[in-house]
UniProtKB/Swiss-Prot annotation:
Family: Belongs to the protein-tyrosine phosphatase family. Non-receptor class dual specificity subfamily.
Organism placement in taxonomy: Eukaryota, Metazoa, Chordata, Craniata, Vertebrata
Outcome of swapping C261S: Loss of phosphatase activity. Does not affect interaction with MAPK1
Protein name according to UniProt: Dual specificity protein phosphatase 2
Enzyme Commission number(s) of this protein: 3.1.3.16, 3.1.3.48
Domain Tyrosine-protein phosphatase: 176-317
Main location per the UniProt record: nucleus
Organism of derivation: Mus musculus (Mouse)
Amino acid sequence: MPIAMGLETACELECAALGALLREPREAERTLLLDCRPFLAFCRSHVRAARPVPWNALLRRRARGTPAAALACLLPDRALRARLGRGELARAVVLDESSASVAELPPDGPAHLLLAALQHEMRGGPTTVCFLRGGFKSFQTYCPDLCSEAPAQALPPAGAENSNSDPRVPIYDQGGPVEILPYLYLGSCNHSSDLQGLQACGITAVLNVSASCPNHFEGLFHYKSIPVEDNQMVEISAWFQEAISFIDSVKNSGGRVLVHCQAGISRSATICLAYLIQSHRVRLDEAFDFVKQRRGVISPNFSFMGQLLQLETQVLCH
């Protein structure tokens, strides 16, 4: 089968073959699956074992450098790159949305550049570099049980009609906390006081982004407080790294964290947006759209949005 120029040795893997590998625990552990679709598409649904590949205009420019530099941009996890370098993985599989073969990949797109970088860096080693034929769209058709679906939106946008809503309850308190990522939830102070709701979500830790909301269940959950007010004078960015480290610590321990403020609209939403920007290297507008799809009432104040834009610049231009 013809292969795109520069990718002559890339093998093409069928969806059924990948599904069989992922169903074998030993083979699944030795398979690195790299999803080159946009971040929002990945979060809506993805192969459970896959890792998202960051991509934006700046990374596009940097990925055109040396293969090692391209791989560092597209696979920023140093520990994972080290595992590849030591030959600990049997295969690295790259996928996009629906390309039928390597020959269809745009030369300046993330899948093509990542395949080329992997081939160069893995040459002569035990790791096979593969492209998934038909991409995620085909794999989801063949192996839906191996794919993860995004949770349904739990809270409608402000002003939206909802026949099940209680007019006595503020819209920001209706429903329950919303899942942003499998280990990251966003909600209000009222949600943080609902023990049954927290347990139903599997929450193990709470990040309280307020100076006034109490920590209701100190003996049951791991709490961290960021005592800031929701006003234009607050430098919430001073807390970004501390908050991100806390969320990552909960993630790494296998737990789930609820981030909340009084209404779950401005302060806690800002922290969740900062986490997405830094951890997933996405633009603010992408992160904002993603979170708003899940919690329609979010609206960080003007100053907080400016601080998030500064973070975006620092992260994406680093």
